[in-house]
């Protein structure tokens, strides 16, 4: 194993851990990351990053995995969500934030409100592509782990970067998100699930999203267990699947009422 793939033989391939960035040379990824311990499934082919942009194809629901781990418990929750959307014939797109380059918000608003514009002034990373996805999707389902009773920093950076969409209302410009639907899924080892969900929702509420009825689903394992047993618990617990199916179903039912079109131009934007 090596962290230098510049001289990788033709028979080998460069792999990058999506969690910590460790580079590995070999025909296939390692069984686990030598640096952060993540399973080999977290590795992606290494190579030059292509800036992400939305291709313009319409779809209904945007699925966001806010975890640093693509294939962990949070990813499993989105697997279940995707299964339910497929079963209902609802179009969707799924993204793992760990696979994309999303920089910290520049906080242009703190300098001058007019500087926080849409499109975002930072057009060099992948977030402008996600801005377009948010403007297009009728509904969003966000899945998040619990990090210290809150969402992980990766997801917070993503949500911080939606400020340019929220600021449209302060600049008296047409909004792009009011009346859309949001659902939230949270999992973790112990405490903080509901707080995490509500912290996430506050961002969307400030953009005019409506939380689907019974639109929050969460499950924790417990501090008395070793975290290495969480994966087996979540994948074998029937309540997890039922709750996710319920949240997804509620989001879809609410979305199909087309509240967004009914409220267009009728809402008074009240946000920070």
Cite the ranges covered by each PLM segment.
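The −1 position to Zn-ligating cysteines in a subset of zinc-ribbon hairpins
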Residues: 16, 32, 104
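Short Cys/His-rich zinc-binding micro-motifs
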Residues: 17-26
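Short, glycine-/small-residue-rich phosphate/pyrophosphate-handling segment
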Residues: 171-217
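Mobile beta-alpha loop/short-helix "lid" or hinge segments that flank ligand
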Residues: 97-103, 174-176, 207-230
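Short metal-coordination and nucleic-acid-contact micro-motifs, chiefly zinc-binding Cys/His arrays
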Residues: 11-13, 29, 98-101, 178
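N-terminal beta1-alpha1-beta2 submodule of the flavodoxin-like/Rossmannoid cofactor-binding fold
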Residues: 2-3, 21-22, 35-37, 45-172, ...
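Cysteine-rich micro-motifs
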Residues: 28-39
